[in-house]
Amino acid sequence: MTARNKRVRCKICGILELEHALAVSDAGGDAIGFVFYPPSPRYIDPAAASRIIAKLPPFITTVGLFVNHSAEQVREILNVVPLDVLQFHGNEDNDFCRSFSRPFYKAIGVGDETDVVAEAAKYPDAAALLFDTHDPQLRGGTGRVFDWSRIRHELGKPVILAGGLNPTNVAEAIRTVRPYAVDVSGGVEASKGVKSIELIQEFIGEVYREYEV
């Protein structure tokens, strides 16, 4: 299998409803994300996330998104929600991220001044690095694309591409970056925080179409 047709994995983040989680699974998605950051319009109560996970089919990875939570807060959520992976979007360091006995992804906001290599080097234990558009006011879910040419594959970690992706641009993003996975939230929403089953299906369909080329 060539690099051209290795299947890119797909994560849909900001899930609030069971029907949308099942739509991800039915369409062939690989992972769903739950946002535990209260200021986000996609915030979900941990008990609600746990109820959704209990009804998921096998082989769907569940990811929890955290932003500068304390270790106690993270553990309280983990006591309620059976997450597979933790995803950190704040100023957490490597030691903090790895302290919960679960794989973790570290989000890196990419702006004009971001030294991508230096930022990546701070997280040697990350299972993957997630690159998103830098915005000092937002932690993910910016809805804006950054310069994909900034991503460097010599980072030595799987690359998850996020930031402004949607069904119309994800194919180009995959061809340009060749990431391990793509991550979308706002790009598959009918309105802020409200997922669209049709857009979820279109987005995942575009990801698979690139694999089939």
UniProtKB/Swiss-Prot annotation:
The pathway it acts in is: Amino-acid biosynthesis; L-tryptophan biosynthesis; L-tryptophan from chorismate: step 3/5
Q: What class of enzyme is it?
A: isomerase
- Give the catalytic activity: N-(5-phospho-beta-D-ribosyl)anthranilate = 1-(2-carboxyphenylamino)-1-deoxy-D-ribulose 5-phosphate
Q: Which UniProt keywords apply?
A: Amino-acid biosynthesis, Aromatic amino acid biosynthesis, Isomerase, Tryptophan biosynthesis
Q: Which GO terms describe its biological process?
A: L-tryptophan biosynthetic process
The protein's Enzyme Commission number: 5.3.1.24
Asked if the record carries the keyword Isomerase, the reply is: yes
Molecular-function annotations in GO: phosphoribosylanthranilate isomerase activity
Which residues does UniProt call coiled coil?
Answer: none
Source organism, top-level taxon: Bacteria
The family line of this record is: Belongs to the TrpF family.
How is this protein named in the record? Answer: N-(5'-phosphoribosyl)anthranilate isomerase
Annotated source species: Hahella chejuensis (strain KCTC 2396)
Q: Report the gene name.
A: trpF
